[in-house]
């Protein structure tokens, strides 16, 4: 059995997919798509090493200790070149994680022809009439190239060292005069590029798990600036001490959302040692944090918030706070509840030295079946 490693390309921006979630993080059952696709291929062969390119290494490492991860580049070729630095096996298989349902039959066809050329690649024939600039092309000469592809590692590295932009391995190797061998591709190996493609693939649907997160934050009164809660001005001068604008509710809610998704906390994302967050709009930071959560495949179910303050009274502001949260997070207002309570004059809150907020949220996997 030939020594071979596997590279899975999962660092793309999913621009053409055109949803809030990056396609590599769509959930298939409980697995993100990148993991589902990698598990599928790794079940067919005892790869020497499996390398996954990523734009979110810390989060992806939570799913497995069996793979190596490397930060992707700005292009496919750059990502592949970086991943190849970790590969020393004679052969390397490269695939896009967006080709989720590669079959064992296709995999075996690639392996069986390993000694035929420098790069073995699956390809589909074109059945439909094909036009270019309104001129009919000879469809018999057209091939739709797919992945996974198997290449001789040294030759692929050399091909990419040309620093030219190639969209797949076979064209890079062919540009150097290398020999390409085509095997029959398959419809199931078509790339998931547009959200409409989901309807063409028989994929497991997301599981119905719910993820709960809590966030707690405290700030001291003392700044002669507006007191903001959920971006709503509560008092013109009773501001809270903070590196940002001091919106303690926004901070608590941000932590709750990050926690439910497993993305750390607000201090990691927006450190108070970074001057670019000085006096920052905390509701805008909340929105950015939720955008990151949505990118990795989650969406909010509901929010419940308890504001603890002896003063000022908040009854007349709760509706405005709920509305502003709904607008910021693109969430139905009926899914948001803001409560206010005192501590009956006990403790630092009762002494009017500061205020605290406890936020709880529930997340679920993004339901891509609605697309």
From Swiss-Prot:
<feature type="binding site">
    <location>
        <begin position="309"/>
        <end position="315"/>
    </location>
    <ligand>
        <name>4-CDP-2-C-methyl-D-erythritol 2-phosphate</name>
    </ligand>
</feature>
<feature type="binding site">
    <location>
        <position position="351"/>
    </location>
    <ligand>
        <name>4-CDP-2-C-methyl-D-erythritol 2-phosphate</name>
    </ligand>
</feature>
<keyword id="KW-0808">Transferase</keyword>
<feature type="binding site">
    <location>
        <begin position="243"/>
        <end position="244"/>
    </location>
    <ligand>
        <name>4-CDP-2-C-methyl-D-erythritol 2-phosphate</name>
    </ligand>
</feature>
<feature type="binding site">
    <location>
        <position position="348"/>
    </location>
    <ligand>
        <name>4-CDP-2-C-methyl-D-erythritol 2-phosphate</name>
    </ligand>
</feature>
<feature type="site" description="Positions MEP for the nucleophilic attack">
    <location>
        <position position="139"/>
    </location>
</feature>
<keyword id="KW-0548">Nucleotidyltransferase</keyword>
<feature type="binding site">
    <location>
        <position position="217"/>
    </location>
    <ligand>
        <name>a divalent metal cation</name>
    </ligand>
</feature>
<feature type="site" description="Transition state stabilizer">
    <location>
        <position position="16"/>
    </location>
</feature>
<keyword id="KW-0511">Multifunctional enzyme</keyword>
<feature type="site" description="Transition state stabilizer">
    <location>
        <position position="23"/>
    </location>
</feature>
<comment type="function">
    <text>Bifunctional enzyme that catalyzes the formation of 4-diphosphocytidyl-2-C-methyl-D-erythritol from CTP and 2-C-methyl-D-erythritol 4-phosphate (MEP) (IspD), and catalyzes the conversion of 4-diphosphocytidyl-2-C-methyl-D-erythritol 2-phosphate (CDP-ME2P) to 2-C-methyl-D-erythritol 2,4-cyclodiphosphate (ME-CPP) with a corresponding release of cytidine 5-monophosphate (CMP) (IspF).</text>
</comment>
<feature type="site" description="Transition state stabilizer">
    <location>
        <position position="243"/>
    </location>
</feature>
<dbReference type="GO" id="GO:0016114">
    <property type="term" value="P:terpenoid biosynthetic process"/>
</dbReference>
<comment type="pathway">
    <text>Isoprenoid biosynthesis; isopentenyl diphosphate biosynthesis via DXP pathway; isopentenyl diphosphate from 1-deoxy-D-xylulose 5-phosphate: step 2/6.</text>
</comment>
<dbReference type="InterPro" id="IPR001228">
    <property type="entry name" value="IspD"/>
</dbReference>
<feature type="binding site">
    <location>
        <position position="251"/>
    </location>
    <ligand>
        <name>a divalent metal cation</name>
    </ligand>
</feature>
<dbReference type="Pfam" id="PF01128">
    <property type="entry name" value="IspD"/>
</dbReference>
<feature type="binding site">
    <location>
        <begin position="270"/>
        <end position="274"/>
    </location>
    <ligand>
        <name>4-CDP-2-C-methyl-D-erythritol 2-phosphate</name>
    </ligand>
</feature>
<feature type="binding site">
    <location>
        <begin position="265"/>
        <end position="267"/>
    </location>
    <ligand>
        <name>4-CDP-2-C-methyl-D-erythritol 2-phosphate</name>
    </ligand>
</feature>
<feature type="site" description="Positions MEP for the nucleophilic attack">
    <location>
        <position position="191"/>
    </location>
</feature>
<protein>
    <recommendedName>
        <fullName>Bifunctional enzyme IspD/IspF</fullName>
        <ecNumber>2.7.7.60</ecNumber>
        <ecNumber>4.6.1.12</ecNumber>
    </recommendedName>
</protein>
<keyword id="KW-0479">Metal-binding</keyword>
<feature type="binding site">
    <location>
        <position position="219"/>
    </location>
    <ligand>
        <name>a divalent metal cation</name>
    </ligand>
</feature>
<dbReference type="InterPro" id="IPR026596">
    <property type="entry name" value="IspD/F"/>
</dbReference>
<feature type="binding site">
    <location>
        <begin position="217"/>
        <end position="219"/>
    </location>
    <ligand>
        <name>4-CDP-2-C-methyl-D-erythritol 2-phosphate</name>
    </ligand>
</feature>
<comment type="similarity">
    <text>In the N-terminal section; belongs to the IspD/TarI cytidylyltransferase family. IspD subfamily.</text>
</comment>
<keyword id="KW-0414">Isoprene biosynthesis</keyword>
<dbReference type="InterPro" id="IPR029044">
    <property type="entry name" value="Nucleotide-diphossugar_trans"/>
</dbReference>
<dbReference type="Pfam" id="PF02542">
    <property type="entry name" value="YgbB"/>
</dbReference>
<dbReference type="GO" id="GO:0019288">
    <property type="term" value="P:isopentenyl diphosphate biosynthetic process, methylerythritol 4-phosphate pathway"/>
</dbReference>
<dbReference type="InterPro" id="IPR018294">
    <property type="entry name" value="ISPD_synthase_CS"/>
</dbReference>
<dbReference type="InterPro" id="IPR034683">
    <property type="entry name" value="IspD/TarI"/>
</dbReference>
<comment type="similarity">
    <text>In the C-terminal section; belongs to the IspF family.</text>
</comment>
<dbReference type="GO" id="GO:0046872">
    <property type="term" value="F:metal ion binding"/>
</dbReference>
<dbReference type="InterPro" id="IPR003526">
    <property type="entry name" value="MECDP_synthase"/>
</dbReference>
<feature type="site" description="Transition state stabilizer">
    <location>
        <position position="342"/>
    </location>
</feature>
<feature type="region of interest" description="2-C-methyl-D-erythritol 4-phosphate cytidylyltransferase">
    <location>
        <begin position="1"/>
        <end position="210"/>
    </location>
</feature>
<dbReference type="GO" id="GO:0008685">
    <property type="term" value="F:2-C-methyl-D-erythritol 2,4-cyclodiphosphate synthase activity"/>
</dbReference>
<dbReference type="InterPro" id="IPR036571">
    <property type="entry name" value="MECDP_synthase_sf"/>
</dbReference>
<feature type="binding site">
    <location>
        <begin position="341"/>
        <end position="344"/>
    </location>
    <ligand>
        <name>4-CDP-2-C-methyl-D-erythritol 2-phosphate</name>
    </ligand>
</feature>
<feature type="region of interest" description="2-C-methyl-D-erythritol 2,4-cyclodiphosphate synthase">
    <location>
        <begin position="211"/>
        <end position="371"/>
    </location>
</feature>
């Amino acid at each position: 059995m030939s020594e071979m490693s596997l590279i899975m390309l999962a660092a793309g921006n999913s621009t053409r997919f055109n949803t809030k979630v990056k396609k590599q993080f769509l959930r298939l059952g409980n697995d993100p798509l990148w993991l589902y696709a990698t598990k599928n291929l790794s079940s067919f062969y005892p790869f020497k090493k499996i390398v996954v390119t990523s734009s979110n290494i810390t989060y992806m490492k939570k799913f497995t200790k069996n793979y190596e991860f490397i930060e992707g580049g700005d292009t496919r070729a750059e990502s592949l070149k970086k991943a190849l630095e970790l590969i020393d096996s004679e052969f390397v298989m490269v695939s896009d994680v967006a080709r989720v349902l590669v079959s064992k039959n296709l995999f075996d066809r690639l392996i069986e022809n390993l000694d035929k050329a420098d790069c073995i690649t699956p390809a589909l024939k074109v059945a439909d009439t094909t036009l270019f600039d309104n001129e009919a092309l000879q469809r018999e000469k057209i091939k739709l190239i797919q992945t996974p592809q198997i290449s001789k590692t040294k030759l692929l590295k050399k091909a990419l060292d040309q620093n030219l932009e190639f969209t797949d391995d076979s064209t890079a190797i062919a540009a150097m005069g290398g020999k390409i061998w085509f095997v029959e591709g398959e419809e199931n190996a078509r790339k998931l590029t547009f959200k409409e493609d989901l309807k063409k693939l028989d994929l497991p649907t997301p599981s119905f798990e719910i993820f709960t997160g809590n966030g707690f934050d405290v700030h001291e009164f003392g700044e002669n600036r507006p007191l903001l809660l959920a971006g709503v001005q509560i008092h013109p001068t009773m501001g809270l001490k903070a590196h940002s604008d001091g919106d303690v509710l926004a901070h608590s809610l941000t932590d709750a959302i990050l926690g439910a998704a497993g993305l750390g906390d607000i201090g990691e994302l927006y450190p108070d040692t970074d001057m670019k967050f000085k006096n920052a709009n905390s509701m805008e930071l909340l929105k950015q944090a939720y955008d990151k959560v949505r990118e990795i495949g989650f969406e909010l179910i509901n929010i419940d918030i308890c504001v603890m303050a002896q003063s000022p009274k908040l009854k007349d502001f709760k509706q405005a706070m709920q509305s502003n949260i709904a607008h910021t997070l693109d969430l139905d207002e009926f899914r948001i509840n803001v409560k206010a309570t005192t501590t009956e004059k006990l403790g630092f809150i009762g002494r009017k030295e500061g205020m605290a907020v406890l936020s709880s949220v529930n997340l679920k996997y993004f339901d891509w079946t609605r697309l």
